[in-house]
């Protein structure tokens, strides 16, 4: 029978009632927030209790706070009074726009009104939305406490399971990220190998606790023996990250401003919309504050006459050594110092410094002579402005005391170089001649820990310094100079490498800095000190023509030249090496090994890595297809006191005997393992051959043939006439002595 409307049920006879359908969960989930007339209202709680007589005074006092974030007036504040003539300790306030109401909630919530009262500010629409009937359960329900699960030890890698104190490194190639134990000459031992672990690059945290992976959605931190995810920071399209020295905080930056849609964001708020930088608390995973990019002043223009945008300075936010402050430079005008973790501006104002070009925190808390309370220290420099000279300054934080200033003249540029212990600050000053056609460099060295911070000038340098590096935890330095104008050319300029150290003085003082030696006619452009000092590599990187590496020892134990008797160094070239297309050179954190690598990010020729010991002897050479990145895993600072470290150095020869024996045993066991493996392979082959021969002999017997195919020939030779044997005689001549005479 064909279907028709006659077969449809009568709506009036339907068994269900629409009013009985419960769709509250759907309404709550898909509720659309419409523009309301109450969006300009806020509710202020936490006010003191007043009566009709004192109410106007409170409103007048409150207006001072309210007007700091928007426009409101006395008539826009409604403070209800109860039947007993006293207020209910809250008030309704109307602003001129919803944006001002939102700003009031952010700026005034939690602000103390006086010693006994703290303001709590919320939007009126939020109270209606979250506080309506049914949203809050009147009956207390105890929170569900999850069962305790022990977390992995994030520094377990420091206890090498092999007991050899090995270091780890991460390698990024193609789309794979691998972490290995370094086994010196032997192949590295793989720990973890994952594909698509990151989308752009990987980065260790400063103390090696976390491995950072970069994604379009944000940043993730990994660690522990099982390499599980420890934290995630949802900053869309993130490009760069920077950790604080103590791994407490993290800065993320994206060239795309943050965009918060109507659906919101899991970690960021509407206030973060349009920002580029976010500073996070690593322990909680929460954002502390966000910032927008600053437009850097440009000194050049393009072909159309428009100013050329300068590249961002990274890191834009620089950390103090104790993780208590982070500062940002507004080039040409000020330095803003923020206190952590609240991220409030120190003393509620930026430090105004006219013309300031750059600044840098001391990498350690300097213990200055004659100062009882040690504070953090940063240095800055300003160029010549009008008739005012250029200036270098040291400022103490949080007191903002200017510890030392130095006036400079004819300055073209300056670079700030802190020594790792903050004992010294070297300001590399490029000065121009009166005609401004030539440049020369001087080094202004601040002795930060000495009383009054004296400054020593090294002005014996005739050429322009293109690279400078302090010895870590030491007082020696290396510079690279050139007489040519450095430009982006395929042929690197000719350079000179110079070494400096203090001269010997009586007592514990440090003498004046003296020149040790200069090596000319080089192509070197990079300096890499061992993290433990003493050894240094001078190399040529990112070059298409030259890729030399020279390994120097600053404390050579051999004979010292007479000219260096009064110096605190004995310089010796230990070894030279070359690595075609080398782009990166990295010391391991113990200063025992050096990895050199050629990354596909720079070129596609012979990508891979080489491994050397500190003396420059090559241990491994590993070509790696689509090689991108190599990074040693950093180590945290030692827990040993200075006395314990001194005791270890004193007994180092005794410890070395044990380590040498372990190395010898390991080498012998490795050789024994190779011999055993080869013997096992030979035995297997001999057994296989015996089985095959047995099978062949059985097949010959079945075919009626002798077991040995050579048996007929052997029988014939045995029955032959022995008289017909042929005797063969061989004569061999041997030269005993050879002389040559010339006959005239």
UniProtKB/Swiss-Prot annotation:
UniProt key word Protein biosynthesis: yes
Domain of life: Eukaryota
Pfam families: eIF2A, RRM_1
SMART domains assigned: RRM
Molecular function terms from GO: identical protein binding; RNA binding; translation initiation factor activity; translation initiation factor binding
Domain RRM: 40-126
Compositional bias ranges of the Acidic residues kind: 11-20
GO terms for biological process, alphabetical: formation of cytoplasmic translation initiation complex; translational initiation
Ranges of biased composition (kind: Basic and acidic residues): 699-714
Stated role: RNA-binding component of the eukaryotic translation initiation factor 3 (eIF-3) complex, which is involved in protein synthesis of a specialized repertoire of mRNAs and, together with other initiation factors, stimulates binding of mRNA and methionyl-tRNAi to the 40S ribosome. The eIF-3 complex specifically targets and initiates translation of a subset of mRNAs involved in cell proliferation.
Name of this chain's protein: Eukaryotic translation initiation factor 3 subunit B
Source organism of the structure: Sclerotinia sclerotiorum (strain ATCC 18683 / 1980 / Ss-1)
Gene expressing this chain: prt1
């Amino acid at each position: 029978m064909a279907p028709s409307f006659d077969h449809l049920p009568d709506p009036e006879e339907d068994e269900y009632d629409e009013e009985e359908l419960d769709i509250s969960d759907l309404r709550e989930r898909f509720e659309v927030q419409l523009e309301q007339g109450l969006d300009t209202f806020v509710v202020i709680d936490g006010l003191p209790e007043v009566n009709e007589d004192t109410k106007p005074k409170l409103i007048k006092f409150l207006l001072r706070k309210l007007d700091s974030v928007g426009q409101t007036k006395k008539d826009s504040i409604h403070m209800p009074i109860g039947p007993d003539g006293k207020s209910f300790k809250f008030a309704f306030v109307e602003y001129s726009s919803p944006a001002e109401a939102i700003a009031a909630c952010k700026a005034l919530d939690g602000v103390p009104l006086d010693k006994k009262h703290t303001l709590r500010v919320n939007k009126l629409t939020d109270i209606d939305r979250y506080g309506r009937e049914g949203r809050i359960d009147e009956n207390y329900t105890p929170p569900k406490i999850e069962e305790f699960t022990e977390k992995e030890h994030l520094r377990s890698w420091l206890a090498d399971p092999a007991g050899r104190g090995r270091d780890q490194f991460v390698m990024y190639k193609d789309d794979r990220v691998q972490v290995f134990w370094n086994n010196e000459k032997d192949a590295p031992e793989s720990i973890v190998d994952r594909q698509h672990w990151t989308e752009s690059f990987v980065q260790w945290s400063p103390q090696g606790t976390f491995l950072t992976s970069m994604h379009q959605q944000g940043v993730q931190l990994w660690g522990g023996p099982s390499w599980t995810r420890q934290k995630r920071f949802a900053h869309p399209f993130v490009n760069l990250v920077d950790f604080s020295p103590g791994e407490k905080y993290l800065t993320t930056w994206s060239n795309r401003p943050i965009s918060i849609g109507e659906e919101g964001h899991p970690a960021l708020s509407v206030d973060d919309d349009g920002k580029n930088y976010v500073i996070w608390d690593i322990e909680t995973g929460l954002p502390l504050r966000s910032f927008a990019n600053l437009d850097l002043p440009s000194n050049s223009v393009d072909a159309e006459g428009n100013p050329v945008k300068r590249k961002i300075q990274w890191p834009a936010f620089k950390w103090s050594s104790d993780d208590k402050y982070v500062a940002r430079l507004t080039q040409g005008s000020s330095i803003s110092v923020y206190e952590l973790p609240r991220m409030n501006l120190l003393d509620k104002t930026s430090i105004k410094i006219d013309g300031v070009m750059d600044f840098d925190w001391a990498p350690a808390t300097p213990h200055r002579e004659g100062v009882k309370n040690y504070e953090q220290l940063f240095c800055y420099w300003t160029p010549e402005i009008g008739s005012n000279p250029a200036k270098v300054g040291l400022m103490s934080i949080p007191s903002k005391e200017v510890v030392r200033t130095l006036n400079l003249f004819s300055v073209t540029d300056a670079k700030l170089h802190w020594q790792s212990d903050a004992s010294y600050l070297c300001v590399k000053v490029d000065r121009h001649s009166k005609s401004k056609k030539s440049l020369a460099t001087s080094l202004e060295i601040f002795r930060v820990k000495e009383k009054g911070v004296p400054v020593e000038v090294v002005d014996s340098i005739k050429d322009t310094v293109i690279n400078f590096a302090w010895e870590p935890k030491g007082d020696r330095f290396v510079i690279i100079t050139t007489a040519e104008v450095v430009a982006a050319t395929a042929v690197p300029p000719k350079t000179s490498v110079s070494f400096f150290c203090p001269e010997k003085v009586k007592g514990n003082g440090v003498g004046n800095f003296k020149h040790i030696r200069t090596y000319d006619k080089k192509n070197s452009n990079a300096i890499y000190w061992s993290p433990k000092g003493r050894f240094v590599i001078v190399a040529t990187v990112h070059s298409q023509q030259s890729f030399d590496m020279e390994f120097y020892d600053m404390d050579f134990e051999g004979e010292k030249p007479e000219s260096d008797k009064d110096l605190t160094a004995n310089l010796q070239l230990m070894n030279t090496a070359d690595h075609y297309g080398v782009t990166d050179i990295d010391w391991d954190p113990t200063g025992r090994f050096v990895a050199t690598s050629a990354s596909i990010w720079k070129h596609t020729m012979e990508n891979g890595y080489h491994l050397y010991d500190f003396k420059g002897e090559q241990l491994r050479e590993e070509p790696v297809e689509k090689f991108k990145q190599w990074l040693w895993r950093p180590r945290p600072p030692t827990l040993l006191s200075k006395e314990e470290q001194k005791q270890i150095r004193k007994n180092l020869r005794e410890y070395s005997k044990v380590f040498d024996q372990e190395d010898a045993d390991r080498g012998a066991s490795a050789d024994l393992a190779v011999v055993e493996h080869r013997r096992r392979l030979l035995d297997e082959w001999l057994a296989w051959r015996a089985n095959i021969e047995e099978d062949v002999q059985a097949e010959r017997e079945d075919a009626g043939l002798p077991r040995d195919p050579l048996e007929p020939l052997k029988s014939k030779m045995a029955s032959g006439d022995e008289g017909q044997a042929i005797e063969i005689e061989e004569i061999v001549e041997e030269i005993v002595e050879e002389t040559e005479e010339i006959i005239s």
